[in-house]
């Protein structure tokens, strides 16, 4: 967590053949696939992209919602989340693409503090 630059680096692990909740990236981000395949799905569940281990991608905010998950094995991905401000990083969406919740730099910073205190 970099308070000055408003950057959060975090490892995510997605289970094999599972999809996380529908969401939209609303801030810049970079990803690096450490293990497995990072799979990107359309809101309807169709496979759009497969990123194998070793894949680096710089991403921009995107109005297109999607789901993500692992391939034949669990996937571990380094996400470098770069909102550069206190605006939302993610919007969590329902099936109608309505915003259920958001995640901000402050939310991730608080989660990090709680983890360090445990």
Each model region followed by its residue ranges:
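A short glycine-rich, His/Asp/Glu-containing loop-to-beta-strand
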Residues: 1-17
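Double-stranded beta-helix
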Residues: 69-118
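Short histidine-centered beta-strand/loop micro-motifs
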Residues: 10-12, 20-25, 42, 48-49, ...
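Short acidic (Asp/Glu) patches
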Residues: 14-17, 35, 60-65
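Short Gly/Pro-enriched loop/turn and capping motifs at secondary-structure junctions
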Residues: 38-39, 64-66, 83-86
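Glycine- and acidic-residue-biased ligand/ion/polar-headgroup-sensing regions
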Residues: 16, 25-44
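Short acidic-glycine-tyrosine-enriched beta hairpin
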Residues: 43-64
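Conserved hydrophobic/aromatic beta-strand scaffold that supports enzyme active sites
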Residues: 9-11, 30, 48, 56-58, ...
